[in-house]
């Protein structure tokens, strides 16, 4: 039987929030089977839990933000969720003492390391996969995203940026996660932004925690970071990283093929909402006996790089 996963013990880290620029502490805690992924605002009295779900997603302009009926928010959740998804974690309580998850280095790698530091515990309950049975597609102008039936998880993603640095890189990427490693191939890809947009955001008291230490920053012609790209195709790989996190709002790995063109947080969420709305287009599946997982989850103690 392929079993559900959580952490062996709790683990904490501290970082800076992207938009407020304030210090934030996050603690990942083990959770029982069938809990899902729950964000807990421990800075509030009483504490407030917000379970990751497609319907809980509110603002998606600059990041993915969860919000409840009382307008309590937790923003910038996508990189942490991407790490959780990439390591196949089904159940987790995430304590956070702010309205945003720290940006860390702009990728999912610090959260992967955090989980690796304590290890993964298997639970005596079958792991549930969301298997796509029929094509599901959403569009927004020239942007689109779709999920097709596939016995595994495959991603075909394209971006289109008219910038001399990005145009020199591959803007289309195909990856099959039945064989490739999320940790090695995706987790290190950093978020990126343009100087003109950052200046506008800061004039509105946003992106106050953004820096060359946690993002790839581009002016009109070049990359301002001194260090080279972590991947030759880091820009499109970060968009895949985001999509993996956004599509994990259902606290379950998807069995299907994701095809996307210029998709972002909003369209990713719209696609997942459409999936849950069209109940005839998907089903829950578990794997009993000696069957192996259709998605490759990196063993946390293995050498990933």
From Swiss-Prot:
The active site is at residue 265. Disulfide bonds: none annotated. Its cofactor is Zn(2+). One of its GO terms (molecular function) is UDP-3-O-acyl-N-acetylglucosamine deacetylase activity. It comes from Colwellia psychrerythraea (strain 34H / ATCC BAA-681). InterPro entries: Ribosomal_Su5_D2-typ_SF, UDP-acyl_GlcNac_deAcase, UDP-acyl_GlcNac_deAcase_C, UDP-acyl_N-AcGlcN_deAcase_N. Keywords: Hydrolase, Lipid A biosynthesis, Lipid biosynthesis, Lipid metabolism, Metal-binding, Zinc. PANTHER family: UDP-3-O-ACYL-N-ACETYLGLUCOSAMINE DEACETYLASE 1, MITOCHONDRIAL-RELATED. Zn(2+) binds at residues 79, 238, 242. Catalyzes the hydrolysis of UDP-3-O-myristoyl-N-acetylglucosamine to form UDP-3-O-myristoylglucosamine and acetate, the committed step in lipid A biosynthesis. It catalyses: a UDP-3-O-[(3R)-3-hydroxyacyl]-N-acetyl-alpha-D-glucosamine + H2O = a UDP-3-O-[(3R)-3-hydroxyacyl]-alpha-D-glucosamine + acetate. Belongs to the LpxC family. Its EC number is 3.5.1.108. GO terms for biological process: lipid A biosynthetic process. Pfam families: LpxC. Pathway: Glycolipid biosynthesis; lipid IV(A) biosynthesis; lipid IV(A) from (3R)-3-hydroxytetradecanoyl-[acyl-carrier-protein] and UDP-N-acetyl-alpha-D-glucosamine: step 2/6. This is UDP-3-O-acyl-N-acetylglucosamine deacetylase. GO terms for cellular component: membrane.
């Amino acid at each position: 039987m392929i079993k559900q996963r959580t952490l062996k013990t709790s683990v904490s880290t501290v970082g800076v929030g992207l938009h407020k620029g304030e210090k934030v502490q996050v603690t990942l805690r083990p959770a029982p089977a069938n809990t899902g992924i729950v964000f807990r605002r421990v800075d509030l009295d009483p504490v407030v839990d917000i379970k990751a779900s497609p319907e809980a997603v509110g603002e998606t302009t600059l990041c993915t933000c969860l919000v409840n009926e009382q307008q309590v928010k937790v923003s910038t959740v996508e990189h942490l969720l991407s790490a959780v998804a990439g390591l196949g974690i089904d159940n987790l309580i995430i304590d956070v003492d702010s309205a945003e998850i720290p940006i860390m280095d702009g990728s999912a790698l610090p959260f992967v390391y955090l989980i690796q530091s304590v290890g993964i515990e298997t639970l005596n309950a079958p792991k549930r996969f969301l298997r796509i049975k029929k094509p599901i597609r959403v569009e927004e102008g020239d942007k689109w995203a779709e999920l097709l039936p596939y016995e595994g998880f495959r991603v075909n993603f394209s971006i289109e940026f008219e910038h001399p640095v990005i145009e020199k890189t591959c803007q289309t990427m195909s990856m099959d996660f039945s064989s490739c490693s999320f940790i090695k191939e995706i987790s290190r890809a950093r978020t990126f932004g343009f100087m003109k947009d950052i200046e506008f955001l800061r004039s509105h008291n946003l992106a106050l925690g953004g820096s060359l230490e946690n993002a790839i920053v581009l002016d009109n012609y070049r990359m301002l970071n001194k260090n080279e790209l972590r991947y030759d195709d880091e820009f499109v790989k970060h968009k895949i990283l985001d999509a993996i996190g956004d599509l994990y709002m259902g606290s379950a790995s998807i069995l299907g093929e994701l095809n996307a063109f210029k998709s972002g947080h909003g369209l990713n969420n719209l696609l997942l909402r459409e999936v849950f709305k069209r109940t005839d287009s998907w089903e829950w599946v578990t794997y009993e006996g000696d069957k192996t997982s259709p998605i490759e989850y990196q063993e946390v103690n293995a050498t990933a790089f």
